UniProtKB/Swiss-Prot annotation:
It comes from Arabidopsis thaliana. This is F-box protein At1g10110. It holds the Pfam family Beta-prop_KIB1-4. It comes from the Eukaryota. Residues 9-56 form the F-box domain.
């Protein structure tokens, strides 16, 4: 190693191979700090990646910046000046990328750490024949066939996928009209550069979209009749519906139909249903988890019957961040506990924010101390925009 005149080691002169060896053992935050040491360390980081991060972070919105809370360190980090993009609101994330939209319902994909920005096509770039009216204030109207006009609509369920190396992306979103989920779903990819509409199911019926999840180029859609649709995006921009899958003809029916429901995927690709139950006798256990049960035979007949059963653990060593559609591995990962659900909830009536981790086996709830002044939710006609969001950032090589 080179030294200065007084014999002090000159760390900026470390060879790239040694720096790369060090970088791959650093945590996400230490890697980010190392990049700022000097120009040689920064350029060495362009061809390196840190240890894969599985620790959930929290995004909090301010006027001109975002605050990001590292749950492992329990520290806040402030983004660079984001200007008007700080008023955008996140609806989905993939790694360090966050899908956001502004008051005029323009969509962007932003990396708050770099910050890189991908502008998505305006809604007018659509082959659906649907016209969008965007008066502002985070709402919009849709005009179908120049006759039917929706009432006030807001962005609903959304998913985002981004390839860290090529920056290819897929964005899928639905909307709610008067707080009721719509059956219409729109998607856009880097190759398409316009908005397309997800076709109706092969049966031709339209069911409202309650939730969506995406993994391994497949989009899972939970509909209002409890059925699950799976669309394969691996063959190009036009998705192909998969009719023969384990969840075909096995709708999910719950005894609490009015409670919030989430559909999530495990790391192995299995579907789990997560239901928020925060009233009555279930205050101690705010979530119920369901999984497709094993095949059994009834006493009355030899027909195989498959249903959904309550489970008290995720597969293997996994945990769930509510704002993500796929569970996370926890083995050998600091800052995240096995069989836990990380969630953030803000009450419309009181604006009291709960940022917590719920341990499924013990029913223990750990609350994070998030100062109230660090988040400024926006109220608009009963809509609370700007809730904090959990996400799991990562650095790819070359960032």
């Amino acid at each position: 190693m080179a030294t200065d005149d007084d014999g002090t080691p000159n760390w900026s002169e470390l060879v790239t191979d040694i720096l790369s060896l060090v970088f791959k053992h650093l945590s996400f935050t230490d890697f980010a700090r190392a990049k700022t040491v000097c120009s040689s360390w920064y350029f060495a980081s362009k061809s390196s990646s840190p240890r894969k991060n599985h620790t959930p972070w929290l995004i909090l919105y301010q006027d001109t910046h975002w605050l990001m809370f590292n749950s492992d360190e329990e520290k806040f980090y402030r983004t660079v000046y984001l200007g008007r993009f700080a008023e955008c609101r996140g609806v989905a994330s993939c790694g360090s990328w966050v899908l956001v939209f502004d008051k005029e319902i323009n969509f962007y994909i932003i990396n708050p750490f770099t910050p890189q920005l991908i502008r998505l096509p305006p809604l007018e770039y659509s082959n659906t024949g649907t016209k969008f009216e965007r008066p502002g204030n985070y709402v919009f109207h849709l005009l179908f066939d120049d006759r039917h006009r929706t009432s006030r609509a807001i962005v609903g369920n959304s998913v985002l996928w981004v390839d860290e190396k090529t920056k290819d992306y897929l964005v899928v979103w639905s909307y709610k009209e008067a707080f009721v989920p719509s059956p219409y779903i729109y998607y856009c990819s880097k190759r398409g550069q316009e908005w397309f509409e997800i076709p109706a199911s092969t049966c031709g019926k339209l069911f409202r979209c309650l939730d969506m999840a995406y993994k391994d180029e497949k989009l899972y859609i939970l509909t209002s009749n409890g059925s699950i649709r799976i669309l394969d995006f691996s063959l190009g921009d036009l998705p192909r519906q998969i009719d023969n899958h384990p969840y075909s003809h096995r709708p999910f029916v719950t005894e609490f139909p009015n409670h919030k429901m989430g559909m999530r995927l495990t790391t192995s690709g299995d579907v789990v249903m997560i239901q928020c139950v925060t009233t009555g006798t279930h205050k101690r256990s705010p979530f119920r988890i369901f999984k497709l049960s094993s095949i059994t035979e009834t006493k009355e007949s030899s027909h195989e019957v498959v249903g959904w059963e309550t489970v008290h653990s995720f597969e293997d060593e996994e945990s769930l961040v509510w704002d993500l559609s796929v569970t996370l591995p926890t083995k050998g990962v600091s800052g995240i506990k096995k069989d836990s659900i990380y969630y953030c909830h803000t009450s419309l009536s009181s604006s009291i924010r709960e940022t917590c981790a719920y341990e499924i086996p013990t029913h223990k709830i750990t609350a994070y101390d998030i100062p109230k002044q660090d988040i400024k939710p926006i109220r608009h006609r009963g809509i609370l925009i700007g809730e904090a969001r959990w996400f799991v950032p990562c650095f790819g090589a070359g960032e």
